[in-house]
């Protein structure tokens, strides 16, 4: 029973959806990847425009509208937030105990809880959560190759300065694609070591760190082997850099991109109206 519980804990890693594409046929899937990437970047910028409860409520509402528009289950987006929830809480706690200003509720040594700290802790928590959610909307509805094409288009002006935009876009898309692969391989290694009696869940922080250390070597070796296999496959298919290459899939703007642009303009307009100046 204990072994089954540990396996279930480990299976959480297989549910991480960072970098995973989930097939679908909703409005968001029909958007041009360039439009999705641009809207995602601008949406993250808009999150930082919010500075009071009304504006945070507005941008949260629009974020959930985007999630609903994907047609995917809420569990998908929860799995996107869950791996980083500890980091979000930690960042919020730093704001809570070290941010000063307003009415002080509690104070001890260098720590204090004030009205300004509570407010900022809540805002930081919402802000990071929304950034992860809207980024998840982008990654689960867009194939890695489409993300690469969108990044290449977005970075195209840098070609004037001789920046290798095509290669940068390819590297980023490959990195996104191999995030879930690394998680899956980590899970396999952990399960193999559990079958040999390894325990990754019991003990303090130092003991857990020592238990995880043996995973790093085989994971590093597997990453190198995967990189070599990928480079060999690309070279065998005649890849010599992206310069001069044609596109199999031609990207075209559609009415769905105009709808999303109007959606974003409405969001920014509401934020500018209701934010505290």
Curated annotation (Swiss-Prot):
Query: Where in or outside the cell is it found?
Result: Cell membrane
* Domain of life, per lineage: Bacteria
One term under GO cellular component: plasma membrane
Q: How does it sit in the membrane?
A: Multi-pass membrane protein
A molecular function annotated in GO for this UniProt entry is: transmembrane transporter activity
InterPro entries, alphabetically? ABC/ECF_trnsptr_transmembrane, EcfT
What stretches pass through the bilayer? 39-59, 61-81, 85-105, 121-141, 163-183, 254-274
**What are the entry keywords?**
Cell membrane, Membrane, Transmembrane, Transmembrane helix, Transport
Pfam families for this protein: CbiQ
Free-text function comment from the UniProt entry: Transmembrane (T) component of an energy-coupling factor (ECF) ABC-transporter complex. Unlike classic ABC transporters this ECF transporter provides the energy necessary to transport a number of different substrates.
Q: State how it assembles.
A: Forms a stable energy-coupling factor (ECF) transporter complex composed of 2 membrane-embedded substrate-binding proteins (S component), 2 ATP-binding proteins (A component) and 2 transmembrane proteins (T component). May be able to interact with more than 1 S component at a time.
What does the similarity note say?
Belongs to the energy-coupling factor EcfT family.
- Protein's name in the database: Energy-coupling factor transporter transmembrane protein EcfT
